[in-house]
UniProtKB/Swiss-Prot annotation:
Heterododecamer (2C3:3R2) of six catalytic PyrB chains organized as two trimers (C3), and six regulatory PyrI chains organized as three dimers (R2). It catalyses: carbamoyl phosphate + L-aspartate = N-carbamoyl-L-aspartate + phosphate + H(+). This is Aspartate carbamoyltransferase catalytic subunit. The lineage of its organism: Bacteria, Pseudomonadati, Pseudomonadota, Gammaproteobacteria, Enterobacterales. Its EC number is 2.1.3.2. Coiled coil: none annotated. One of its GO terms (molecular function) is aspartate carbamoyltransferase activity. The gene is pyrB. It comes from Yersinia pseudotuberculosis serotype O:1b (strain IP 31758). InterPro entries: Asp/Orn_carbamoyltranf_P-bd, Asp/Orn_carbamoylTrfase, Asp/Orn_carbamoylTrfase_sf, Asp_carbamoyltransf, Asp_carbamoyltransf_Asp/Orn-bd. GO terms for biological process: 'de novo' pyrimidine nucleobase biosynthetic process; 'de novo' UMP biosynthetic process; amino acid metabolic process. Catalyzes the condensation of carbamoyl phosphate and aspartate to form carbamoyl aspartate and inorganic phosphate, the committed step in the de novo pyrimidine nucleotide biosynthesis pathway.
Length: 311
């Protein structure tokens, strides 16, 4: 069966329909159950990270190797022609696209991946994060984890806590879950880091229920998923960071009265916002969530680079 993601740029989670999201998740589940070590044999994929990353970069590169493909690229753009000689991003992508079958790209500038897609010819760009904008593959692994732990993606009560202004993961995840039915959102953040107005407007236009809170305690008993985020020091001025960094911290005592099926997720890295005593509770699932990134990213790359895929 022809697959609709073949050679498709994956820039925003909004580039994927509900059917396409479900296709990726089915493929991820299949790859988790039955590895396919030669699925992308003879393919070459560029890993271009213009911004620091540990989990996302290593997860992508591991995914590439486990599918039998080769990976080339860089994790520090300061040593590239773009960083040292002033080459434009457009020229950099125009050249790299002549070497490889796909490009995985992270960049600090919002919209950089979509710009790159204009200059990569028929070589698909996979956005691994562009500034505070989008992080679609994190969203895919989040969806995969929610489905794995809850058995569904409809009728989920989810709280998102912390930095909802600059946290691209919560923007993408809210947009993705809005494609499913009956989901309810609880947004818990200080005013300075509130969910952007365009996300709230999208929910209102779709008549999706959401509420704003200043306390985690009042919503925990209603939740299926508690999605914690860190305050992003690199995107705040020092005075603002100092004011908000410790405002929302999850401790195991905060989970008293939680539903049995509750899972605590976090895109990582964790700084102060989840204390280590939470790790020992049955609710903690953030390390397994990170591990699911391998299968979600394998699935996406396999679909983007195979005209027909039946697993």
């Amino acid at each position: 069966m022809a697959n609709p993601l073949y050679h498709k740029h994956i820039i925003s989670i909004n580039d994927l329909s509900r059917d396409e999201l479900e296709l990726v998740l089915r493929t991820a589940a299949s790859l988790k159950k039955t590895p396919q070590p030669e699925l992308l044999k003879h393919k070459v994929i560029a890993s271009c990270f213009f911004e620091a990353s540990t989990r996302t970069r290593l997860s992508f590169e591991t995914s590439i190797h486990r599918l039998g493909a080769s990976v080339v690229g860089f994790s520090d753009s300061s040593n590239t022609s773009l960083g040292k000689k002033g080459e434009t991003l457009a020229d950099t992508m125009s050249v790299i696209s002549t070497y490889v079958d796909a490009i995985v790209m992270r960049h600090p500038q919002e919209g950089a991946s979509r710009l790159a897609a204009q200059f990569s010819g028929n070589v698909p760009i996979v956005n691994a994060g562009d500034g505070a904008n989008q992080h679609p593959t994190q969203t895919l692994l989040d969806l995969f984890t929610i489905q794995e732990t809850q058995g569904r993606l409809d009728n989920i009560n989810i709280a998102m806590v912390g930095d909802l202004k600059y946290g691209r993961t919560v923007h993408s995840l809210t947009q993705a879950l809005a494609k499913f039915n009956g989901n309810r959102f609880f947004f818990i953040a200080p005013d300075a880091l509130a969910m952007p107005a365009y996300i709230l407007q999208m929910l209102e236009e779709k008549e999706i229920e959401y509420s704003l809170h200043e306390s985690l305690e009042e919503v925990v008993p209603e939740l299926d998923i508690l999605y914690m985020t860190r305050v992003q020091k690199e995107r705040l001025d020092p005075s603002e960071y100092a004011n908000v960094k410790a405002q929302f911290i999850l401790r195991s005592s905060d989970l008293t009265g939680a539903r049995d099926n509750l899972k605590v997720l976090h895109p990582l890295p964790r700084i102060d916002e989840i204390t280590t005593d939470v790790d020992k509770t049955p609710y903690a699932y953030y390390f397994q969530q990170a591990g699911n990134g391998i299968f979600a990213r394998q699935a996406l790359l396999a679909l983007v680079l195979n005209a027909e895929l039946a697993l």
